[in-house]
Amino acid sequence: MVSTRGVLYYLLRPKELRPILQWKALHGLGHQRDEKNESPDVKACYQYLALTSRSFAAVCQQLDRELLMPICIFYLILRGLDTIEDDMTLSKEVKEPLLRNFYTTIYDQTWTFNDSGTDEKDRELLVHFDCVAREFHKIKDEYKIIITDITKQMGNGMADFVVSGDLTGIQKIKDYELYCHYVAGVVGDGLTRLFVEANVADPSLLKNPRLIESMGQFLQQTNIIRDVREDHDEVRHFWPKEVWSKYAQDFDHLVSPKPQDRKKALQCSSEMVLMALNRADDCLNYMAGVREQTVFNFVAIPQSMAIATLELCFQNPAIFDKNIKITKGATCQLMIDSTQDLQHVCQAFRRYARRIKKKNHPEDPHFHDINAACNKIDRFIDDRYPNLQDEQAKADTMYLAVLVLGVFGVVAAIL
C-alpha cells in the first residue's frame, strides 16, 4: 500500500507517476508463469531469483519459454559463484577450490553449502543449491555446455583475484577491466552463445567479441561506480589505484566530506564514468543484432538502466556518501522504452548522454573526452536514424501542448 507521503510525492511529480502507471498496465506482456504445474525445484529457483535480484527477475520474465529457465539457472549458478567470492568470512584457502571447481559442482544434484557468513545476502541460495543443480540437469545439453564453460572461466578468474588479494585494492586499469571481464564480460559471451544457439540473435555477433565485451563492461563498470561507498565500507576497492591515486593520496580522501577532497573525488569519478561511457555505442551496436523481441527486452532493459545510472552518478557527490539509485518513475520509463525497439532505446541513450553533457563543465580535466564520448553516442544514432531528432522534437512539442492544455483545464475547473 502506498503511504500518504508517497501519494504526495507523485502528485507533485506527475512525470514520475505516468510511466509507473503505464508500466503496471503493460508489464503483464512478459512470460506468464504456470505455477500450478511447476515442480518444487522450479518454484524454488524462481524464489531465489527474486531474492537475489528483483530487477533481474523482472527482466527474466520478458524471455520466451525456450530461454527462460536456462537463463534463470545460468544466473543462479553465477550468483552462487559471486556469493562465494563476496563472502569476507571465508578464507582464501576455502574460496579458491570452491571457485575453481564450481563448474563441476553444478553437476552434483545433492551439493549444498552451509558455511557462508550468516549476514551474506544470498546465503540461502547456496544452502539450497541442490534445487538449482537438479534443474540444470534438465536443460538442453547444448545450453549445459555453454553454461559450464562460462562457469569455469568465471570461477578461475575470480579465484585468481582472490589469491592475489586484488579484491581489496585493484592496482591497474588493465586489472580493473580484467576483473570486469571475468564477472561480466564472460557472462555476455555466454548469453550471446545461448541466444545464437536458440536462433534469436545474429550469429555474426560471435565474430565481434568487442561488442559482447562492452555489454558486460558497461554494466559492471557502472555498478562499480555506483557502489563505491558501499564497497569502501566493506574494505573492497574496485576503482583502480592507477586512476584514484591521481586525485588522492589515500582512498579515504575520496569519501571524505571535506570540500577540498570532494572536488578531487568528483574529478576521479569523471574519469571512471568516462571509461564506462566509451563503451555505450558498442552496446547499441550489439542490440542491433538481436532478432527476437523478448530477448531484445532482456538485453535492452539493463543497458538502459546503466546509462541512466551513469548519468545519475556523474558529478554527483552523493555517491561518496551512500548508495544512490534512479527513481521508480525513471525506471519504469526506461523499461517501457526498452521493451519496444532499438529506436526507443537510442532515444533513451541520447536523452541521458545529453544530460551528462549538460552536467559536464570545463573545469573538469575530462571535459573534452566526456563530450566526445557523448557525441559518439549521438553519431551512432544519427547514422542509424537520421530523422530521429525531428521526430523527438515533434513529440516534445505535442507533450508540452497537452500539458499546457491540461493546466488550463484544471485552472478553468477551479475558477
Swiss-Prot record:
Enzyme Commission number, as recorded: 2.5.1.21
Membrane topology: Single-pass membrane protein
Compartments reported by the entry: Membrane
Cofactor section: Mg(2+)
Function: Squalene synthase; part of the gene cluster that mediates the biosynthesis of squalestatin S1 (SQS1, also known as zaragozic acid A), a heavily oxidized fungal polyketide that offers potent cholesterol lowering activity by targeting squalene synthase (SS). Catalyzes the condensation of 2 two farnesyl pyrophosphate moieties to form squalene. The presence of a gene encoding a squalene synthase supports the identification of the cluster as being responsible for SQS1 production and suggests a likely mechanism for self-resistance.
NCBIfam families referenced in this protein's UniProt entry, alphabetically: squal_synth
GO term, biological process aspect, one: farnesyl diphosphate metabolic process
Disulfide bridge positions per record: none
SUPFAM superfamilies with a match to the protein in the record: Terpenoid synthases (SSF48576)
Family matches, as InterPro entries: Isoprenoid_synthase_dom_sf (IPR008949), Squ/phyt_synthse (IPR002060), Squal_synth-like (IPR006449), Squalene/phytoene_synthase_CS (IPR019845), Trans_IPPS_euk-type (IPR044844), Trans_IPPS_HH (IPR033904)
A single GO molecular function term of this UniProt record: squalene synthase [NAD(P)H] activity
Protein family per UniProt: Belongs to the phytoene/squalene synthase family.
Name of the encoding gene: clz20
Coiled-coil residue windows: none
Pathway: Terpene metabolism; lanosterol biosynthesis; lanosterol from farnesyl diphosphate: step 1/3
One Gene Ontology term, aspect cellular component: endoplasmic reticulum membrane
TM spans (from-to): 395-415
Enzyme class: transferase
Catalytic activity: 2 (2E,6E)-farnesyl diphosphate + NADH + H(+) = squalene + 2 diphosphate + NAD(+); 2 (2E,6E)-farnesyl diphosphate + NADPH + H(+) = squalene + 2 diphosphate + NADP(+)
Organism superkingdom: Eukaryota
Protein name: Squalene synthase clz20
